């Protein structure tokens, strides 16, 4: 009876060995649903170039997460993450130079009304009174460190009307982020290349709602889009995030790419950084240059002690395990659970 609520029973939990592994195949799944909150409000904020402001903002977000105010986490993007979903690389203004010059980056950011860093989060409360108190806490925590902080209530969602157009637009899957794959592409522009990002201006008041994305014209393979992700897990504090950001800025610039960075809270104490390398595959040598840059990022993150949240098929060729008995134990488990080696051979360092 309680199997779907407490499936572990007595003894070791085996769940973890099937996470990001090739030790088994999922055949059954149970989804836990939660009651609709009585009050929902979204907020958006932006931060300038100051490293101290970035540190203080991240430390404040960590405290809000630890205290339970931000139970659903937050999203935090640098300007390039948003710009790449709103427009192409400004080739004419840059005079063909890559990566994007700092002065032009600031100018494009100013025209778009963006901060150097831009974030959003959601408050879930029992009722409006509880929500007002949580808003006060968020304002007092973030207000002193950010350039802009706005709130937007979603009356339809707070009233439990999950079928309203605004709620459906907010919750529906979107391919808008695919636009960043076209950042360096000079031709074959998809019809929806000019659009407002979900974390762009006005994101606090119904962010993402009412934005129309027509992805039918996008074909990344046909259009020669190159896109590589690196996703290290970072301690959620300003010092470590700043080290990671500085590393990305230095490595990408030295290889001719922009530092396209996003931070996604993966818990109360950690954040996943998503670093994107976008390039034009039709340019000779770009594939190789992007791979070299990716390898350099992965090596730097490993040296700093930031493990990958997800591994690309390229990264799976090399082991990133610590120098302990983990690899040997995993190999024995693999041999026991999949003696013929038929499940995703060569993946996940097994």
What are these regions (language model features)?
Residues 1-4, 9-18, 28-30, 101-107, ...:
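Glycine-rich, charged/polar anion/phosphate-binding loops
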Residues 1-66:
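FAD-binding subdomain of flavoenzyme oxidoreductases
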Residues 29-38, 104-114, 218-222, 266:
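Short, flexible, solvent-exposed loop/turn segments with mixed acidic/basic and small polar residues
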Residues 39-42, 46, 111-150:
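A conserved active-site cap/scaffold subdomain adjacent to cofactor or substrate pockets
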Residues 45-50, 120-129, 231-238, 277-281:
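Short beta-strand-to-loop capping motifs
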Residues 51-57, 126-136, 239-243, 283-290:
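Short, conserved charged micro-motifs
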Residues 57-101, 240-256, 293-294:
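Short amphipathic alpha-helix segments
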Residues 112, 141-350:
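Conserved glycine-rich FAD pyrophosphate-binding loop
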